Regions:
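Hydrophobic transmembrane alpha-helices and immediately adjacent juxtamembrane helices
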Residues: 1-137, 142-254
Length: 254
């Protein structure tokens, strides 16, 4: 049986830490996204009127949200578990009568919650720039939650793997950010030459952005079923990796 009190203590601690750094945790990603709207939505949008029948300013909204969700989910979760390792507080958590599942629910739940809040703030902010309408609110919410949970798990893995703050930033900067920008955030992959279209399909972020965009406009580069399958596959893969890390004590007992 899950010790909900233990989960709540970890969850509350992580959420309070976010409120103490409110400007960095919530305002910063929203301001960055707003600047993307100004630069890409206004400047480039005046030259590219429509993509697949959707005004360019509207077209980039799901991609910009996904950009913020991915980066913030990873950052929140990776720092959330790495900092206790760095300070040695993780040993207090591991020695307490708390199961790995409860530790995971506390840290990942808090990281995902912070990202979901950011997602909704960005959604509200987007309405100041474009007349936003969501065709499938249920699927939008489903992709939002699945993405935040999946990449919070991925961030948790990075936080356990990293030996220093440089490694903590290595994967997000060198891998995640390029994948997001090359994943159809600001364009449709149909605009690419056939060869690059085929290469782009190996980018998992394409399926996240495509499925999320479909929930807004019923426009996508790949089918909704494939997008959902990729998200679920990534989710269960991360769960399996975290389970292995706890089972073997990888970077937890060092």
């Amino acid at each position: 049986m899950i010790n909900l009190r233990a989960v709540r203590v970890i969850y509350r601690y992580e959420m309070l830490r976010a409120w103490e750094t409110l400007l960095q945790s919530f305002a910063s990603p929203v301001i960055s996204t707003a600047l993307y709207f100004v630069v890409f939505g206004s400047a480039i949008g005046s030259r590219i009127e429509h993509i697949e029948g959707v005004p360019y300013g509207l077209f980039i909204v799901p991609g910009l949200m996904m950009l913020a969700l991915l980066t913030q989910s990873i950052a929140n979760a990776s720092f959330g578990i790495y900092f206790p390792r760095f300070t040695g507080q993780i040993y207090e958590v591991l020695s307490a009568p708390i199961s790995p599942t409860e530790i995971l629910l506390g840290y990942v739940g808090a990281a995902a919650t912070k990202s979901i809040i950011i997602g909704f703030i960005i959604l509200l902010t987007a309405n100041f720039f474009v007349p936003l309408q969501i065709q499938h609110p249920f699927w939008m919410l489903a992709f939002l939650i699945l993405t935040c949970v999946s990449f919070s798990l991925f961030g948790f893995i990075i936080g356990l793997w990293a030996d220093n703050f440089e490694q903590l930033q290595l994967i997000p900067i060198l891998i995640i950010t390029p994948l997001v920008f090359l994943g159809g955030t600001f364009y449709s992959i149909d605009m690419l030459p056939p060869t690059w279209q085929a290469v782009t399909l190996f980018n998992p972020v394409v399926y996240l952005v495509s499925g999320f965009r479909w929930s807004f406009f019923e426009v996508s580069d790949v089918s909704i079923g494939i997008s959902l399958s990729v998200v679920l596959l990534f989710l269960f893969t991360c769960i399996a990796i975290v389970w292995w890390m706890f089972r073997t004590g990888y970077r937890l007992k060092q």
